């Protein structure tokens, strides 16, 4: 889901929007090209879609008065854990129940999988000094509590790739 919306009869609309700037899903690794870590792309990764964003992602919660369009409040979460934020999901619930927790996977940042040409394409939007080129960022599974903004992060081992969550643990579930 690209964004989530929930509302009730209290004249409030809540939009929860994950955003991942500089993740270009139209780009692919080409064999032999130079990557941002200085290595060259091998045949093992040639043809792979570039899985990494060049900046941190964010999760925004906007509260809006739907009648006037007035923004009543906004919270934005952005940190090293949201690097490569992907589409989210939530645990099954009744339609009249509010979403409590959203789950997201992240790609992290793997400098050996990002061509220098992609960084050059986005050079006006990216401060390469802020990119974790030496250390990278591991992929994660995130649990975002909408009401509080609390983020629980489950770290994946280096070299793993995590896809959108399809099994979502829930309180009281078996």
In which residue ranges do the predicted regions lie?
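Beta-propeller domains
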Residues: 1-174
């Amino acid at each position: 889901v690209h964004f989530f919306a929930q509302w009730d009869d209290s004249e409030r609309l809540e939009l929860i929007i994950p955003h991942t700037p500089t993740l270009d899903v139209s780009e692919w690794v080409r064999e032999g090209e130079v990557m941002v870590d200085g290595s060259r792309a091998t045949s093992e990764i040639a043809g792979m879609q570039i899985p990494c964003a060049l900046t941190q992602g964010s999760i925004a919660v906007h509260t809006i008065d739907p009648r006037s369009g007035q923004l009543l409040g906004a919270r934005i979460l952005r940190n090293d854990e949201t690097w490569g934020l992907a589409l989210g999901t939530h645990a099954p619930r009744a339609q009249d129940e509010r979403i409590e927790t959203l789950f997201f996977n992240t790609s992290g940042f793997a400098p050996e999988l990002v061509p220098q040409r992609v960084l050059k394409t986005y050079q006006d939007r990216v401060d390469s000094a802020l990119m974790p080129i030496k250390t990278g960022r591991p992929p994660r599974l995130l649990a975002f509590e909408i009401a509080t903004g609390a983020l629980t992060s489950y770290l994946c081992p280096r070299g793993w790739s995590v896809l959108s969550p399809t099994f979502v643990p829930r309180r009281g579930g078996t």
